[in-house]
Swiss-Prot record:
One of its GO terms (cellular component) is plasma membrane. This is Phospho-N-acetylmuramoyl-pentapeptide-transferase. Pathway: Cell wall biogenesis; peptidoglycan biosynthesis. The gene is mraY. Pfam families: Glycos_transf_4, MraY_sig1. Catalyzes the initial step of the lipid cycle reactions in the biosynthesis of the cell wall peptidoglycan: transfers peptidoglycan precursor phospho-MurNAc-pentapeptide from UDP-MurNAc-pentapeptide onto the lipid carrier undecaprenyl phosphate, yielding undecaprenyl-pyrophosphoryl-MurNAc-pentapeptide, known as lipid I. Belongs to the glycosyltransferase 4 family. MraY subfamily. It is found in: Cell inner membrane. It catalyses: UDP-N-acetyl-alpha-D-muramoyl-L-alanyl-gamma-D-glutamyl-meso-2,6-diaminopimeloyl-D-alanyl-D-alanine + di-trans,octa-cis-undecaprenyl phosphate = di-trans,octa-cis-undecaprenyl diphospho-N-acetyl-alpha-D-muramoyl-L-alanyl-D-glutamyl-meso-2,6-diaminopimeloyl-D-alanyl-D-alanine + UMP. It comes from the Bacteria. The lineage of its organism: Bacteria, Pseudomonadati, Pseudomonadota, Alphaproteobacteria, Hyphomicrobiales. Its cofactor is Mg(2+). The chain crosses the membrane at residues 27-47, 72-92, 99-119, 139-159, 169-189, 200-220, 240-260, 264-284, 289-309, 338-358. It is a multi-pass membrane protein.
Amino acid sequence: MLYLLSELSGVFSPFNVFRYITFRTGGALFTAGLFVFWFGPWIISLLRLRQGKGQPIREDGPQTHLLTKRGTPTMGGLMILAGLLVAVLLWANPRNSYVWITVVVTLGFGAIGFYDDYLKVTKQSHKGFSGKFRLGLEALIAVAACVAVAEYSAPGLAYRLAFPVFKDAIVNLGLFWILFASFVIVGAGNAVNITDGLDGLAIVPVMIAAATFGIIAYLVGNVIYASYLQVNYVPGTGELAVVCGALIGAGLGFLWFNAPPAQIFMGDTGSLALGGLLGTVAVATKHEIVLAVVGGLFVLEIASVIIQVASFKLTGKRVFRMAPIHHHFEQKGWKEPQVVIRFWIIAVVLALLGLATLKLR
């Protein structure tokens, strides 16, 4: 809402600062972080009181988890989403369609994750509601979002897929683009969800990806920078940098409480929502393929589960000691902090590779 003050800059010139995306991105980051940090202890206490036993821990998982993680409350994604929403409403341009599309997907995926977490906690079971039904709901939200993105895209960009590195490589997929882009959003949500298995493991790579796509959104939403980098100029997407800034701030606030030993888990409430947000930003900025690079860690995690399940069904043998792959390394003797920090390093390297695609032509 503060963006609207820029329209009064003729009356009070300092209000002109609210025109700048970079300023508002910083404001969103600070606001979201402060909100989560300030209200975090109260939210954690409330969730612990309501949930009692907290998130159920896998009996077939690493045995150390049964001792160190049992009783920890889940649904910490509520903290992240609250901080994110407050910051976006305060600092983003309320007239920007891409902002609202991203917010709707984030809250929609968050609601699905919340219900799943609720069932797991109340039943003290790892099984929430039907996986097929959950994917169906996610797909409906994603398809609606992709149709909206196509509707608001500039002429010549709707239903088109851009390829990184290659100059002017953009293909008109027609309505198939809706299916592809929806797959990106749903896949991103579930990939982050799979990754969220150790203290701090998911939130830091999410913030790294958000920072990367915040930069991408800012550049492709600026006609001068887009022309210089020879990437597709996508009007209006620069405002998504503010959303990414809010995510980073909320993530930092959450990490304060999620750092090992975690006081709270984000749960499906957070992981599905944040993955959906990243997928939507990638779709809006026409950098869907780059998301597979920047979010390569998430791709690796979900691929390990797919490979494990497929191998066991086809051959009766497991490729990994345990899936997702972060548990595989735990079973090999890596300590939890080793797995987490090494995976963070991988996320940083992949983010830099993703940014490099902007310049390579």
